[in-house]
Amino acid sequence: MKPHRMTGFATRKANDPHHLDEDGFPFDQVTEDALTFVREHDDRPFFLYYATWLVHTPIHTRSKALLDKYVKKLGVELPDDPRAKWMGEGQTNPFYCAMVEQLDYYIGRLVDHLEQTDDPRWPGHKLIENTYVIFTSDNGGMEGSRTQIITDNHPLDRGKISLMEGGTRVPLIITGPGIAKGVESDVMVNGLDFYPTILSLAGAMRPRDKLFDGCDLAPLLRQDPTNPNLVREADGRVRDTMIWHFPNSAALESTIRIGDYKLVRNYDHLNNPNNRELELYRLYNSEGDRPARMDIEEQKNLADSMPGKARSMNRRLTEALTEMKASYPYYNPHGHRSPDTKTHVCTVLSHRQTGDSVKFTYRENGAEVVRANLIYTLNGGARYEEWYRTPAKIVPGNKAVAKLPKGTTHYFLNLIDENNFLRSYPEILNQKNPSKAQVKY
């Protein structure tokens, strides 16, 4: 909404692209497209992936009435300057609340259509009776940014861009034929399970040449949604383990959940008093008939009192990440909290390009260079540059050589040493447009 989120509210004018409907909600193109798709395909089996923009940033609403409703309900006041920061703590952001209600309304329209529409392939029945609905999210709520507090995932810790429970524990509702109603479950599942589950529920053949990372949840859903023994790996073993790997952005962590316990491995722990290398939490106690909630808030770190448990889970995490050839975060030689070995980072002395071949010469300063990658783009200077990685070869004489892929417009070299420091050449000054580096090619 331009110039700011206190402008551009929807009206009832016919030529308003966001015009209000009979219930006073703004027009939503994604919802209309979803309804159109169902209407055009309800005479045959269909799959609809309804990925709404709500409640993603930017946090705003086209409904002035909803905004006013939540300003009053929350007892807050909008700032005189519409561009001012919104730093009200907790769940007190009226813009976000309005977005949540809009989301509820739009999903309701889709469900209402399924409930009210006859199934052309099943006379006497409605579409909803032959449709599975899965409602979930790709991550926990975004709690805030530098300019505003959006929401609070209390009692869970943190939110989006984190592997703490506030970032990974998300809503999940599954309904459809053969699934018991109103059953709450603490069984551990994730989004990777949806593909094999949908194939199973639809009676579709599983591709023989595909290795599924997720499990088929159909037995769990159809028999007893509270029984974790019904979630099994391809080899028949009960699944009791999941991992999450977020080595970049603000997270810089990996986690593993085994049964009741969750281990958090923080990569940004050296010279950082705010982070422990390992954190261990017992989320549940499954010793009884049903799992009992223990510490999903992740407030009691057991790493010191259960060091053996922490070590064994950390080894298991390493094994899993090694199997999938996971990447890890590197140290920045310019970082003020980087280890002292940053003084041993190599220095790139020169580079030379001949046709599509490029050679870099470097000097080691106490740490061996163990890996090199060429980072390149085919559309340098475009509004949205897309960059790729390809291995460079380390050869005798402290040199790295690589072949430029056809169409390369810009490139740079990454050298990684034995202490996990990364040296880029040339230095990247503009992270949004890496082609604007110190050296032009």
Where does each model-flagged region fall?
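A long, amphipathic alpha-helix that forms part
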Residues: T31-V38, L74-T131
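Active-site regions of oxyanion-processing enzymes, predominantly non-cytosolic
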Residues: F27-G75, T117, P123-I134, E165, ...
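Formylglycine-dependent
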Residues: M1-T61, D81-C97, A180, R276-L278
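Active-site rim elements
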Residues: P17-G24, W86-C97, G159-I161, G178-M188, ...
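Histidine-centered active-site microenvironments of extracellular/periplasmic hydrolases
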Residues: P58-S63, H113-I179, V189-N190, H269
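Long, internal low-complexity/basic segments
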Residues: A292-R371, I375-N379, P391-H410, N414-Y441
